[in-house]
Swiss-Prot record:
Reactions catalysed, as given in the entry: carbamoyl phosphate + L-aspartate = N-carbamoyl-L-aspartate + phosphate + H(+)
Organism taxonomic ancestry: Bacteria, Bacillati, Actinomycetota, Actinomycetes, Micrococcales
Organism listed in the record: Arthrobacter sp. (strain FB24)
HAMAP family tied to this protein: Asp_carb_tr
PANTHER family: ASPARTATE CARBAMOYLTRANSFERASE, ORNITHINE CARBAMOYLTRANSFERASE, MITOCHONDRIAL
Role this protein plays: Catalyzes the condensation of carbamoyl phosphate and aspartate to form carbamoyl aspartate and inorganic phosphate, the committed step in the de novo pyrimidine nucleotide biosynthesis pathway.
Binding-site residues for L-aspartate, renumbered to this chain: K82, R177, R232
PROSITE patterns tied to this protein: CARBAMOYLTRANSFERASE
InterPro entries reported for this sequence: Asp/Orn_carbamoyltranf_P-bd (IPR006132), Asp/Orn_carbamoylTrfase (IPR006130), Asp/Orn_carbamoylTrfase_sf (IPR036901), Asp_carbamoyltransf (IPR002082), Asp_carbamoyltransf_Asp/Orn-bd (IPR006131)
UniProtKB keywords: Pyrimidine biosynthesis, Transferase
E.C. designation(s): 2.1.3.2
Known partners and oligomeric status: Heterododecamer (2C3:3R2) of six catalytic PyrB chains organized as two trimers (C3), and six regulatory PyrI chains organized as three dimers (R2).
Full protein name: Aspartate carbamoyltransferase catalytic subunit
Protein origin, superkingdom: Bacteria
One cellular component term from this protein's GO annotations in UniProt: cytosol
Length: 337
């Protein structure tokens, strides 16, 4: 694996390899000294053309825990705001000796462009490009789900996939790079995925995605789900009215207090509620749901550091071979429900 640009082209073997390596990195986070010398002498650049405090800090923490040197580059106030191109910026970073570039860009495809050129000889990690993809968010979501799924089955999570897990991804799918990355990765891992959204917030061509589509949140919950991923309503990307009112949106597609109570009445005692953050409390998710024991929001933040440590380590370790797939036999033979 030379770059991490998309989950669509991530093989099952590589996906499980990243998740298993993240398990090892998580164990480091439980130690008193949360640091490894694995990337000492390497330089990781966080190249952010869009603001994202959470993702940048997570990548910075991941790189520093591996003893890498970190350079944070924000487009605001930089030469980029004066008209410098992506090519010129990349070549400048190459001259500084960057070994990995974590890029977030407003334009879909920018990380792929950077990786495909000879502007810089460095590993490229997509930290979110437009409305296209956000692979490390999908990986940390899958990591969180896999740990939960393994606990339910009483098996180790290492080597396991997500066969039989039912996942609903609900909300602003149209503008969500998280939804796209999650659909591809979760299907690769064997989960059954349902998108839940109003028709106005579903992208053209969604029928070709490897998932089912529903317009009814309550109907989806009634069919049974093991995890619900609530997506942020991205008002900053909307230049028109995509739903009547915020109150109507919350009532029909948000995870409110009534739906939180409904999980118990439906017998879904082990269903978890997820959100990539930041949350619009009272819109796509109620405070009661976000703060409930079912919520994995803080676990996702914690797991994000481990997953990003794994990605950086694997990309900079020099081993680009496709790993052999050795699934957890005990887990794979469990009867899915």
């Amino acid at each position: 694996m030379k770059h991490l640009l998309s989950t669509e082209d991530l093989s099952l073997a590589n996906a499980i390899r990243i998740l298993d390596t993240a398990e090892e990195m998580a164990a480091v986070g439980d130690r008193e000294v949360k640091k490894l010398p694995a990337l000492r002498g390497r330089t990781v650049v966080n190249l952010f053309f869009e603001d994202s405090t959470r993702t940048r800090i997570s990548f910075e923490a991941a790189a520093k825990r591996l003893s890498a040197d970190v350079i944070n580059f924000a487009a605001k106030g930089s030469s980029v705001s004066k008209g410098e191109s992506l090519k010129d910026t990349a070549q400048t970073l190459a001259a500084m000796g960057a070994d990995a570039v974590v890029i977030r860009h407003w334009a879909s495809g920018a990380p792929h462009r950077l990786a495909a050129t000879d502007w810089i000889d460095a590993a490229v990690i997509n930290a979110g490009d437009g409305t296209h993809e956000h692979p490390t968010q999908a990986l940390l979501d899958a990591f969180t789900m896999r740990r939960h799924w393994a606990r339910l089955h009483g098996t180790p999570s290492a080597g396991a996939d997500l066969k039989g897990m039912r996942v609903a991804i609900a909300g602003d799918v149209l503008h969500s790079r998280v939804a796209r990355s999650n659909v591809w990765l979760l299907r690769t891992l064997g989960a059954e995925v349902t998108l839940v959204a109003p028709p106005t917030l579903l992208p053209i061509g969604v029928g070709q995605w490897p998932c089912s589509v529903s317009y009814d949140m309550d109907e989806t919950l009634a069919k049974g789900v093991d995890a619900v991923v609530m997506l942020r309503v991205q008002g900053e990307r909307m230049n028109a009215s995509f739903f009547p009112t915020t109150r109507e949106y919350s009532r029909r597609w948000g995870f409110d207090d009534n739906r939180l109570r409904a999980l118990d009445s439906l017998g879904l005692k082990d269903t978890i509620i997820m959100h990539p953050g930041p949350m619009n409390r009272g819109l796509e998710i109620s405070s009661a749901a976000a703060d409930s024991p079912r919520s994995t929001v803080l676990a996702q933040v914690r797991n994000g550091v481990s997953v990003r440590m794994a990605a950086l380590y694997l990309l900079l370790s020099g081993d680009t071979r496709e790993p052999a797939l050795t699934p957890n036999a005990a887990y794979s033979t469990k009867e899915s429900h």
